[in-house]
UniProtKB/Swiss-Prot annotation:
Residues 346-372 have a biased composition (Basic and acidic residues). One of its GO terms (biological process) is inner mitochondrial membrane organization. Residues 1-36 form a transit peptide. This is Altered inheritance of mitochondria protein 24, mitochondrial. Its main location: mitochondrion.
Amino acid sequence: MVQPLRRGVRPLTWTRVLPRQTRQPASSHRRAQARYVQIRATPTDQPATVNGSNVPIVDTPSSAESADARFEVIGAPYSLLSVTLSASQNLYTRRGTLVGLSGKADNVISTLSVLEPFRRAPVGVPFLYQKISSASPVTALISTRSPVTSFAVVHLNGSVDWMVAQRRALLAWTGRSLSIRPTINTSLSVAHWGSSEVTGRGLLALVGSGQLYSVELKEGEKYIVHPSNVVAYTVSSKPPRPYRFKSTSLKLQVPGLKSLPTFLQNTQFIKAMSETDSWKTAMRIFHTVRTWSRMTIWGDRLFLQFDGPSTILLQSRGARMSDVLSTQEVNEFASTPRGLTIVPTKQEEKQKGSEQDGKDDVHKAPGTRSVDEIEQEIKGVTQSIAVLTKEGKVVFQKPGQQ
């Protein structure tokens, strides 16, 4: 019995595992091949350097307070808005964003308000808001349905007006003298299409995609930013202007009849073809393809230039180009040369017009005197005496001559 057991039993082999410190050669070889990458968050209280100028890019304030209300952004990353209202103070918030409310619920009155639908609907600005008022102080929580949004609060003291650039950035506001007017694009300006001008005194709550940051520009400073990342900015005497970067571009030209010679344009065949439905449909398709290519392929060149002093609220995740710019604006920017597209003011136009009129008057003014008259004026006035001779001839003599 013992022999079979001994045959089936094998000695156990073991290996001693040395600590990492004792394996100096292998450890040093592995350490030489390793690459250490250290990632640290950039402090937001330090100004960022842009083209040699210190342009501070900081986080938006988390709270704002007035005499009758207080807005405070809570949560990480900024997912809730806490609103503290005093008695008889009105709060306007977007429909479906109220999460909860603390206080005497019997004193709270909630009504659905329709704010200027005929002015807001054409530009895509929401016009259904919930009006909340209470006879006693209450605290409300407000949120949005999107999981990638953050809040920013703005305190308006009446000295500086704000322009909300994004159509759905306005979430809530309060203030008895606060006025919000939607602006309609009438002059193809990117700064006022689908925007809302905010004036007066009160508190404003804005929402953006991703994280919101504030850019402070001083006098003489300039900043170029993509329009889809601009949430709001202060209204100043220097509105933002469109800017295009230099890059290689493929020009798409829509075939037109004006490019043909003049004798071909006047033919009956060309005139009849331009009036057909097939030609108009083809032109419409060509224009649509050109606009789509400008929005998708060359859309990164369309920017806005802000001049200080100004405050800009930016969102880290930009919206679609079609949500910010209209097709007419895209075609207008793409057709302009690179650089800053400056729109002349009325005063400059009047000054140029008066100068041009003066030049035209100088060129068109008829001469009042001939060359002979001018030469005669330079030489002076001379006097001659006509003398009739015996032969019947008339001879002109100067005075004193015999």
